[in-house]
């Protein structure tokens, strides 16, 4: 509890932006402004932390904040961009389509592996929240299935690292982590909202991961 409280204090003072209900990304060591960059990735990992904090403490604020972040990037941003999630934003949370940072950590375009992760986190939040009515399961499936269709390499297996906003492969490298996220996402679908095609995808991806 002490560690969670200490971390929450730092996040509340420096990173959480109550207006949009999102985390900013970065500061200098003395807490002076470093950049105006805003990103999806920090918020995605923020959701992971918030859900873990909720499970550890039962404090509703953590679940509520996770839900606000998820709504922004799934119900709003993904739905407006063909169920692909833009990665990079300006300080007022407008999509920055021209941003291109470090190709490993802040690549241009969209990242299918993050769609898998967001889909899994949306289902996790929905389950913890008592499975309320609404579009969470359907939106999670839309994210996951779009990434499966866009990025799977039918000849070699695995997923392309990045896509353009049109869904075309930008960086074809197939790293280990997107397939692990995809396996976890489809496992959540099988647990919470199963469809006949899910088992086939689950086994197909495990066969690739085992090679």
Label each PLM-derived region with a short phrase.
Residues 1-211:
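Glycan-recognition and catalytic cores of secretory/periplasmic carbohydrate-active enzymes
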């Amino acid at each position: 509890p002490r560690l969670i409280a200490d971390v929450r204090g730092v996040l509340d003072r420096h990173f959480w932006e109550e207006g949009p209900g999102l985390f900013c990304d970065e500061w200098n060591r003395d807490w002076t402004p470093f950049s105006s960059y805003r990103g999806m990735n920090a918020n995605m990992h923020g959701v992971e932390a918030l859900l873990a904090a909720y499970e550890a403490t039962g404090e509703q604020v953590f679940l509520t904040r996770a839900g606000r972040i998820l709504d922004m990037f799934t119900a709003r941003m993904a739905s407006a961009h063909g169920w692909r999630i833009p990665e990079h934003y300006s300080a007022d949370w407008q999509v920055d389509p021209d941003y291109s940072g470090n190709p490993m950590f802040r690549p241009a375009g969209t990242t299918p592996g993050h769609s898998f992760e967001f889909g899994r986190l949306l289902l996790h939040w929905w389950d913890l929240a008592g499975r309320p009515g609404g579009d969470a399961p359907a939106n999670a499936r839309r994210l996951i299935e779009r990434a499966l269709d866009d990025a799977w390499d039918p000849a070699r297996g695995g997923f392309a690292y990045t896509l353009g906003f049109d869904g075309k492969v930008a960086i074809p490298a197939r790293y280990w982590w997107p397939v692990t996220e995809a396996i976890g996402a489809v496992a959540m679908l099988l647990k919470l909202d199963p469809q006949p095609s899910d088992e086939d995808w689950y086994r197909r991806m495990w066969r690739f991961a085992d090679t």
